[in-house]
Design a protein with these regions (language model features):
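A preference for well-ordered globular domain cores
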Residues: 2-3, 9-35, 44-197
Length: 197
């Protein structure tokens, strides 16, 4: 992905002409913002059509003020997305694959439920309902494993958030994918650890 700038131009007169950025299906263009008369875009793809010379199309670097605005906006988007993991008690998108071999809700409500079960189970076993609503007969030790994995997943989500934030803060405004990239958080799959041991 690369940063480009151009200056749209409209000529006056009875048959005025507007010169602007030419697009095609082979490239993805995201408008990043404007500074003075220039429009800054991020373009993904190499098959950029020839542009009218009147628009002064060129590879460019974002001006510092526009870069700062974009960084602030992206950090706010990241924070809002990450708060879904903390602020929403029930989050159906937040699940892990446990080392016990099944999917488990890992949101705050599920963690609280696990803590409650661990507190009252004693030496008995209990039915635990997984992410797919399948019952599993589990011991206290197995419930503790699930809780530990849910908490570890939460730590991993924060590490992913901080990595995105560091990349945004370190963006230079030249060829920074993170200025337009979608934030994707990956939930943990603890079943892989069993296979790799």
């Amino acid at each position: 992905m690369a940063i480009y700038s151009y200056t749209p131009l409209t000529t006056t007169g009875p048959y005025g002409t507007t010169y602007t950025l030419r697009r095609n299906e082979d490239i993805k263009i995201v408008e990043l913002g404007k500074a003075k008369t220039k429009v800054y875009v991020s373009i993904q793809g190499t098959d950029i059509p020839e542009q009218p010379e009147q628009i002064d199309f060129k590879k460019d670097t974002l001006p510092a003020t526009l870069l700062a605005e974009i960084k602030q906006k992206r950090l706010a988007e990241l924070t809002e997305l990450a708060h879904d993991f903390d602020d929403r008690v029930l989050n159906t998108n937040m699940y892990i694959v446990s080392s016990l071999g099944f999917k488990v809700n890992a949101d705050l409500r599920s963690q609280n439920n696990l803590r409650g079960l661990i507190e009252i189970i004693g030496d008995n076993t209990t039915n635990f309902i997984d992410y797919t609503n399948t019952a599993h007969e589990l011991t206290k030790a197995q419930l503790e494993v699930l809780l530990h994995e849910c908490v570890e997943n939460g730590v991993s989500l924060y590490q992913q958030k901080w990595a995105y934030a560091n990349s945004i803060n370190n963006a230079t405004g030249k060829d920074d994918d993170l200025l337009t990239q979608e934030f994707v958080f990956v939930m943990q799959d603890f079943s892989k650890e069993i296979v790799n041991e």
